[in-house]
Amino acid sequence: MKAVNYYRERYKDTGIYENRLFDGIKELLSNLKKEGYITALATCKPEIYVPTILKYFDIEQYFDIAVGSELEGGARRHKDDVINEVFNQIIKLNKADNAHITNASDTTNVSDTADILNNIKADSIMIGDRKDDILGAKNCGIESIGVRYGFAEENELENAGADYIVENVQDIITTLDE
């Protein structure tokens, strides 16, 4: 437990700033927002640090939703857990956006929520640079774009079953436009 505590202390003070944005990411995020996409961050970094990281890189304004893992044995420890929480938050946004349409006493039934979730999944794509991103997407029933310019080892994205694999940020745009 001492090692875990040491790691967390170091990460909190230093580690969260040892990331970098890949070239073109800010522009990609800005364009996605301008085009009306709902953008979400699904990271296994501890959620408590996510706002700090987004602010540090000046990209918080590009995300509608940002979800991270939970510390101390929380329910969100794996990528698919994090992605599913993103879906839960999108459903809540969808219900809030449509609240004016229904009577305040009405409730959305389970089949409506399932339909909403299926529609969200059909319109979602996970972009990631590691097998956990790709496998998390598969476990959640959504497509994935594996990016080679990240941290994946050779053939990692292919072996994980990425639906698309791109070499650079521009290729992400091309893939999304297809």
Model-derived features: positions:
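Small-residue helix-packing motif on alpha-helices
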Residues: M1-A3, V50, S124
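Short, structured helix-loop boundary elements
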Residues: M1-V4, F22, K26, E60, ...
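Short, basic/glycine-rich phosphate-binding loops at helix/coil junctions
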Residues: A3-K12, Q61-A66
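Short, acidic loop-to-helix structural element flanking the phosphoryl-transfer center
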Residues: E9, D13-L41, E47-P51
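Short beta->alpha linker loops
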Residues: R20-G24, K45, D129, Y149-A152
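Asp-based, Mg2+/Mn2+-dependent phosphohydrolase catalytic module
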Residues: S30, L54-E178
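Short "lid" loop at the C-terminus of a central beta-strand within the Rossmann-like core
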Residues: P46-E47, S69
